[in-house]
Amino acid sequence: MTEPLAVALHAVNRGALGDDDVPIVIGCGPIGLAVISVLKMRGIGPVIAADSSPARRALAAELGADIVVDPRETSPYDSWREVAAVSDPARFGRQTALFPTLPFRPSVVFECVGVPGVIQQVLAGAPACSRVIVAGLCMAEDRFLPTFGVLKEIDLVFSLYYTVEEFARTLAHLAAGELVAEPLITSRVGLDEVVDACRGLSDPEKDAKVLIIPA
């Protein structure tokens, strides 16, 4: 479990979240769920999570996500506006010429889906001046319109793997019980069940992470 959580730790580090930032996690597969776990460990929130899978939404809630939505029914960005609104100008996020008086805390969006079209959806939906951390690994050609990012002055950051130090830190957090990982483990199988377990990973309702226990 150290490896996916280290990936998440690196993504959160790349997000450089401040005390007032409100994170939005798009996609609650293994990496998105791990990002939620790291955010909760660090006391960052409220955490908004979005996924179309009921099973994954349930896992996100179990890991501590404060608001969990089905994006087909409720926009996570609408949820952000509800919880990020503030009256103190000192807590406002970054302002721009086009968006000079947005009375909201800053937003950091974690794209943890990794399929074509999602970056464009995030750029179109994310609040102005968001930081978008792309942690989902899209293996196909993708396209998005830079105009959305330019007009909103969105910071687009890509994240991959982790450093040696981050891996060691993640392992230490797990050993100390500071990082919640148990809900991520949805199945435990022996070596003779690995093939069937791998086939089942294509079903988002079945498993998040499968732990292989050698006999």
Describe the residue ranges of each PLM region:
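Glycine-rich phosphate-binding loop and adjacent beta-alpha segment
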Residues: 113-176, 213-215
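C-terminal hydrophobic helical "lid"/dimerization subdomain
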Residues: 97-98, 120-123, 164-215
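Short helix-loop-beta connector
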Residues: 16-23
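Adenosine-nucleotide cofactor-binding segment
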Residues: 25-28, 40-117
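A glycine-rich, Thr/Ser-enriched phosphate-binding loop motif common to dinucleotide/cofactor-binding enzymes
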Residues: 1-13, 26-34
